Amino acid sequence: MQDTASGIDIIENRTYDEIAVGDSAMLVRTLRPEDIRMFATMAGEVNPAHVDPEYARSAQFREIAAHGMWGSAMIANLLGTQFPGPGTVMLSQNLRFAGEVRIGDTIAATVTCRRKSDHGRHVLFDCVCVNQDGTRVIDGQAEVAAAAF
């Protein structure tokens, strides 16, 4: 929805009652060098495998790789801005980092409602991130408290 007076897109949520088991949402992003620099700066995580091309070539990655938590942040972004959206409180994330994400990779993060619990409006999501080749690079679960309204 757009606020016609300001031209700003308004983010809307899906409340706990509007979420059904099996519902899902997806966010797609392509990793850029500036994403890695911004994430390293924001997190203070300046491991040379993520920021120094020479070091990365000599290390296990062979080239600069994204911070694993970049994918985790994509999932948090998806849950907090799209599904369920504003009012969502992250309770936990349990993720497995199954593959590397490199500059130029396009990652599709998908969250799917696995279970709802009326107590506290808790929702458990299955989370999967795949690259442009369909290779799973992250999987796991996230639990949130969804908004009541």
Annotate each PLM feature.
Residues 26-31, 96, 143-145:
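Generic structural detector for well-ordered beta-strands
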Residues 81-105:
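Mid-chain, well-packed structural core segment of small domains
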Residues 2-88:
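Hot-dog-fold acyl-thioester-processing enzymes
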Residues 1-21, 101-149:
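HotDog/MaoC-like acyl-thioester-processing domains
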Residues 48, 84, 100, 146-147:
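Proline-rich low-complexity regions
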